[in-house]
Each structure stands twice: as structure tokens, then as C-alpha cells.
């Protein structure tokens, strides 16, 4: 394995430890990492934001840069956001979906328009409490079956489509 290939593997490994500040999930499992390039001790990471106006973008960038700069052999770490293609639920890994569900956050399989399921009891007998949850990427619901409130991840592309 070349030094560049070894560093690339280390970079991917360290990215798996960087968590989103608003969600209990690594940015790799959330599907934020679009590309990683390594050359001569320089690392360049391109991220896809879940929401364009997400207030956590600067925090995520700082966390990624800090983690990368701590790696031996990294002289320079550049992190930028790309808006070439929108983030979608398809980018999230099964492990990421499971972590969010374990945290009590429902995640639609593919579209926000799917019926919501309570992460506590699995019931679909739920009601939307507010489309505007504690962060721009979550909505709040209440389960009629177990009476637990819960949050549901909402993909931005689906919300925009539902308003047309």
C-alpha cells in the first residue's frame, strides 16, 4: 500500500468518527462526504449539506478540519461544501438510519410523504405536531398509540416538492 493510499484510508477512518452536532450520527453515515482527495500531505474533503441554511455547517467544517489536522502526515486540510447535487435520504447508510432510530428519530425510507412510524412502538397512528422542529431538518410528531412525542428527519428536496 502506498503512503497516499494509507493516508486516504486513515482519512476515511477519521471521518467516521466526526459526528453531526445536531444529530447522533457520523457524517459518513449521514452521507455528507462526497469526495476525499489526498496528495502530498494535502487532504481535500467535499461535503454535501443536508440543508443549505443548516446552522451546523461551520461546526461540521471545523470538526472535520480539526480531526484531519491531527492525523500524522497531513500538512493541509481543506473542507468545502458542494451544491452540485442535493443531499437525499439515499445517501444515508443503513447504520446511520439505525442510529437515528435508536435515538428516537424517525427516518422515512425514501420520501417525507411516506406515513410516519413511531420509533418507540412502530405505530403509524401518528399526527404531525409541527413541520418546524428543533432544527430545520426535523419535524415533530405525536404517536396516538403510545402517546410519545418524537421527531422525524425531513429531507429538504421532498419538502420543496410538496409546496409546488
Language-model features: where?
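Domain-level signature for proteins that mediate thiol-based redox and metal-cofactor handling
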Residues: 1-164
Amino acid at each position: 500500500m502506498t503512503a497516499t493510499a494509507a493516508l486516504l484510508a486513515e482519512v476515511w477512518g477519521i471521518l467516521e468518527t466526526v459526528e453531526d452536532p445536531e444529530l447522533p450520527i457520523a457524517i459518513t453515515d449521514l452521507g455528507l462526504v462526497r469526495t476525499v482527495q489526498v496528495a502530498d500531505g494535502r487532504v481535500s474533503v467535499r461535503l454535501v449539506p443536508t440543508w443549505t441554511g443548516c446552522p451546523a455547517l461551520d461546526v461540521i467544517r471545523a470538526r472535520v478540519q480539526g480531526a484531519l489536522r491531527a492525523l500524522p502526515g497531513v500538512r493541509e486540510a481543506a473542507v468545502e461544501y458542494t451544491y452540485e447535487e442535493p443531499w437525499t435520504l439515499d445517501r444515508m447508510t443503513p447504520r446511520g438510519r439505525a442510529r437515528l432510530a435508536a435515538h428516537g428519530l424517525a427516518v422515512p425510507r425514501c420520501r417525507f410523504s411516506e406515513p410516519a412510524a413511531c420509533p418507540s412502538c412502530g405505530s403509524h397512528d401518528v399526527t404531525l405536531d409541527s413541520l418546524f422542529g428543533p432544527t430545520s431538518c426535523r419535524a415533530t410528531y405525536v404517536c396516538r398509540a403510545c402517546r410519545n412525542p418524537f421527531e422525524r428527519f425531513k429531507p429538504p428536496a421532498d419538502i420543496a416538492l410538496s409546496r409546488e
